[in-house]
Amino acid sequence: MIEFDNLTYLHGKPQGTGLLKANPEDFVVVEDLGFEPDGEGEHILVRILKNGCNTRFVADALAKFLKIHSREVSFAGQKDKHAVTEQWLCARVPGKEMPDLSAFQLEGCQVLEYARHKRKLRLGALKGNAFTLVLREVSNRDDVEQRLIDICVKGVPNYFGAQRFGIGGSNLQGALRWAQTNTPVRDRNKRSFWLSAARSALFNQIVAERLKKADVNQVVDGDALQLAGRGSWFVATTEELAELQRRVNDKELMITAALPGSGEWGTQREALAFEQAAVAAETELQALLVREKVEAARRAMLLYPQQLSWNWWDDVTVEIRFWLPAGSFATSVVRELINTTGDYAHIAE
């Protein structure tokens, strides 16, 4: 299995270094649900601003304040502790008057707004996230500038970030140990983390191998293509390759890579043979996903940061702003810009 740091680069390995997250204010994330609260219902959506505390910790504190069980507080996604983040929490408080959430106090956390909502906020139920990052001590401004220009046109690999695999790769190591035994894993969180790490690692490996091709965005027979921003896909046939290539070049269609699991992967013929060969050595992880009935799926191979802009504060400091759809990793963008340094260089979303 290829280590995250050794995955293939789309724009070549960065020539310079830089410091990511010298302080939490250098990494700002604003969650975009893609909808507004209903204004009525048994749930309360709470928009919070936090710094120095993780999402689960804040959710548990909110549950305690509202005198409800912690399982009654949900969120669309985890946000990093070592960053300044805005996100929504959802508390189920049926048949009660609206509590005064302005009285909720927690160090490093502030309630920005709250309103009633009809439905529970479920994991993954967000449109995306807006990022504002500050890279400091940049050693090669010209290289970073050119890479930002290139990313506007060609995007970046849609890799799962290193944080998906746990500190020191612990989640992936757990998956490998589990794959080598038939011992049931009772802990639901461990099951989820380990299976997710296994599937994400296989996806990254497939993308890394595809990026070694001369023309990364060349459609081949049997590729699974999806409309940009959509989840469904269709299979490319030889007769359609020229027209499909035009639509991929126009960013109307995206080439996808497999999230291996049980069932068909989605590709056929040449594309399927390539994907299977890319992860042929990872038989244990593939068998684990099939054994645990994790359904195969697809994910876009490349990621195009939206609304990408940047501003150099000086020759060694740049502020970068962009928006990414849900499930994408800001660190996969930064990775194409600089070789990061700092204690939290890999911890982002």
UniProtKB/Swiss-Prot annotation:
Q: Which residues are annotated as active site? A: 80 (nucleophile)
User: Which residues does substrate bind?
Assistant: 27, 129, 329
What are the recorded Gene Ontology BP terms?
Answer: tRNA pseudouridine synthesis
Please give the name of this protein: tRNA pseudouridine synthase D
As for family, the record states: Belongs to the pseudouridine synthase TruD family.
An annotated Gene Ontology molecular function: RNA binding
- All copies of the TRUD domain together span 155-303
Keywords associated with the record? Isomerase, tRNA processing
Please give the GO cellular component terms listed in this UniProt entry: cytosol
**Pfam families noted in UniProt:** TruD
Superkingdom of source: Bacteria
Q: What is its EC number?
A: 5.4.99.27
Catalytic activity annotated for this protein? uridine(13) in tRNA = pseudouridine(13) in tRNA
Report which gene this protein is encoded by.
Answer: truD
Instruction: Please tell me the species this chain comes from.
Output: Shigella flexneri
Report the protein's function. Responsible for synthesis of pseudouridine from uracil-13 in transfer RNAs.
